Regions:
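Phosphate-binding site recognition
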Residues: 1-423
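Metal-dependent nuclease catalytic cores in nucleic-acid-processing enzymes
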Residues: 175-182, 335-343, 432-436, 440, ...
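Conserved catalytic cores of phosphodiester-cleaving nucleases, focusing on short active-site segments
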Residues: 431, 455-470, 484
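Structural motif
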Residues: 145, 462-464, 498
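Domain-level recognition of nuclease-like catalytic cores that cleave nucleotide substrates
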Residues: 489, 493-519
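Active-site metal-binding core of divalent-cation-utilizing nuclease and nuclease-like domains
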Residues: 136-140, 434-460
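Mg2+/Mn2+-dependent nuclease catalytic core
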Residues: 165-170, 470-487
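Acidic-basic catalytic patches of nuclease active cores, encompassing PD-(D/E)XK
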Residues: 410-443
């Protein structure tokens, strides 16, 4: 199987014999749904390939769609002039970079349709784009299709410079203004991006812009469902399973755990990150692919400023008015986390109209916790290797939580004083972050018939039941586990169980006492 890793052009995938998961039925539906559409999805989720597929369709390239769903849906295969505006082709840390990109795009289409430039390197972008659209319509006798990929790339690059961002916004608003003026000459306008900016103020004059982002019927237009993966990549999963000494079902479960879990609407099925899953099948390894670039520092700092931690953002109830909102003035990290793909919809409650948000999968959870660990740890990732080795040797292999807690205490002892809060939940959040970073199967606040267990950690052979205390002692923690019979929730599980009581000193602000019972 040839995997289209890094390939975002539809004709190159088809002509090159690369694997393609058929999304063309949805492409056809989009093309006939409305004139002006907007879709946001996280990075590396197939937005550019979707744009390229739409371009091939509107250019009437029937040969590329042989054997695909759209071949039976489309009868006419009309050819339309297509203007493809790709804003991801550059970096926008200076205003001149934006001017260079826009001039380049316009010059190419002015040459194609023999439109004279108003003046050399003219920055009267609205008039130039309007002239191109009018000329394309006049010369072909067909309405024009405009495809705008990653419209918000300049806004993201300028996020830390308010003056530059305002300048960029004004330039883009002018550049795209002909999309309203030339409405009669337009057959279809499609805009993609990662996030919203002031309710798409850049396109504020565009008539009847339909937003597909949270519509159930388009939830699967980017990314792969498990059904699609099992149908397309059966042999690849078998090869992955053999390489990793798993059964087929175990391999599917492992891939699901690491890369599935995105939901983009109320009724969305689970969606796999396409970039991660094809890389994993190609490498036959469970690595971190999408998250390799890490979490922006400003986002981690904002989480700290707002008092949000891993426990809160991994199980957060919010209305869509909180997370599906503009992000250029970041006062709440939740919209950025959701729109960037760090959080996804886990559940929807119709009565309250609230969504439960959380990490979509293990790749994101582990990657995000690693970013927070860098913030917590005075040595950056210097302590990670030692903790990781201790975790797998002590906790996973030997069932020796006592030995691991000795290593963990050393880490806590070196915490910067300014990062330590005087409450039990803070230490619980940090401990959860550490275990998540280590790839542990860790569940915080697990409900029982008589309360909530602070944390439950499971390995193939062991179950660890944690109770954390602050300013008390480990015996008090163990007594609570026994009194409330937290262990009874796992009575039918044949794995060895351990009760783990940990106390954090209100004086030294580190682990000062622990007790491990069971085995």
């Amino acid at each position: 199987m040839k995997y289209p890793i890094g390939i975002q052009t539809f004709d190159k995938i088809i002509n090159g014999g690369y694997s393609y998961v058929d999304k063309t039925a949805l492409v056809y539906k989009m093309a006939h749904y409305a004139q002006n559409l907007f879709l946001s999805r996280p990075r590396r989720f197939g937005k550019s390939l979707l744009v390229s597929t739409l371009q091939a369709y509107f250019e009437g390239r029937k040969d590329l769609f042989k054997g695909l769903a759209i071949e039976k849906l489309e009868q006419e295969w009309e050819v339309y002039p297509v203007i493809h505006i790709d804003m991801s082709r550059g970096k926008y840390y200076q205003l001149k970079n934006l001017h260079a990109i826009l001039n380049g795009i316009l010059s190419n289409y002015e040459d194609l349709y023999h439109v004279g430039t108003l003046s050399e390197n003219s920055d009267v972008y609205s008039e130039r784009l309007a002239n191109i659209i009018a000329a394309a319509c006049q010369q072909t006798g067909k309405q024009v299709v405009v495809l705008i990929d990653e419209y918000d790339a300049p806004m993201h690059d300028s996020m830390n410079d308010e003056k530059l961002q305002n300048q960029i916004r004004n330039v883009l608003r002018d550049f795209f203004s002909p999309l309203k003026q030339q409405d009669a000459n337009l057959r279809f306008v499609f805009i993609t991006g990662i996030s919203k900016f002031s309710q798409l103020s850049i396109f504020s004059e565009l008539n009847n812009l339909k937003i597909l982002t949270m519509k159930n019927e388009y939830a699967t237009v980017c990314g792969f469902t498990e059904e699609e993966i099992l149908k397309k990549y059966t042999e690849d999963i078998e090869a992955f399973a053999e390489e990793n000494e798993m059964t087929y079902d175990e391999a599917v479960a492992a891939l699901r755990y690491h890369y599935d879990g995105y939901h983009f609407s109320e009724k969305s099925p689970g969606i796999y990150n396409p970039f991660s899953i094809i890389n994993a099948l190609d490498d036959k390894e469970l690595n971190s692919y999408w998250f390799s670039s890490g979490t922006p520092t400003f986002l981690v700092e904002l989480l700290q400023k707002k008092g949000l931690d891993m426990l809160q953002i991994d199980d957060l109830w919010a209305s869509d008015k909180r997370f599906d909102v503009p992000t250029e003035k970041i006062t709440d990290p939740i919209p950025v986390l959701y729109q960037s793909g760090y959080l996804t919809i886990k559940e929807y409650d119709k009565q309250s109209r609230l969504y439960r948000l959380g990490f979509p999968n293990e790749e994101v959870r582990q990657g995000f916790s690693t970013s927070l660990f860098r913030y917590y740890s005075p040595d950056g990732m210097g302590k990670y290797d030692a903790l990781c080795r201790a975790y797998y040797d002590c906790v996973v292999r030997d069932g020796d939580m006592d030995a691991f807690l000795s290593h963990l205490k050393t880490f806590y002892d070196k915490f910067p004083y300014t990062l330590v809060n005087n409450n039990e939940r803070h230490y619980q959040a940090v401990m959860y972050t550490i275990f998540a970073m280590l790839g542990a199967d860790i569940t915080p606040e697990q409900p029982t018939s008589d309360g909530r267990i602070d944390m439950v950690l499971k390995t193939d052979d062991y179950i660890y039941i944690f109770e954390l205390k602050y300013g008390k002692d480990a015996v008090t923690a163990i007594n609570q586990i026994e009194k409330k019979k937290y262990f009874s929730a796992f009575a039918d599980d044949k794995r060895k169980k351990f009760l783990v009581g940990i106390n954090f000193s209100d004086d030294s602000r580190t682990i000062d006492d622990w007790s491990v019972i069971g085995g």
